[in-house]
Amino acid sequence: MTWGYRLIPEAVKDLKKLDGSQRKQVIKALDKLITNPLPKAEGGYGSPLGSKNGVDLTGFLKIKLRGAGLRIVYKLVRIEGVAYVLIIGARAESEVYEDAMRRIEAFEYWYESLD
């Protein structure tokens, strides 16, 4: 199957805020991700997220860019063959996940339309 990715508008803003080298690393990571965006348990690159400290991201996946100190959180919609990128952010504690949760709540229509 051929996979693609799509950034929600807020994730596009996240990408634009990064410096040039970080932006290149993120784009490279996204290009690698679409070669196999499945969870690691299925041989892919994504690590499943769950519920922790009141933040429920069950059904979402993440990839870490260790060198850049960034995380990318995405929702894989298999039937469409698309990884929807919700947030690109720093790995500071659980901050990126809390921001991701706020984005889900703020864009409930978008989130519901993924399923």
Residue ranges and their predicted role:
Residues L33-T35, E80:
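A short beta-strand-loop micro-motif that forms or neighbors metal/cofactor-
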Residues M1-K32, Y109-D115:
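Arg/Lys-rich, positively charged N-terminal/basic patches that mediate binding to nucleic acids
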Residues K13, L65-D115:
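Enriched for short, Lys/Arg-rich terminal
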Residues E10, V55-T58, G69:
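Short, conserved clusters of charged catalytic residues that mark active-site
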Residues T35-K64:
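A short, surface-exposed loop/turn module that caps and links secondary-structure elements
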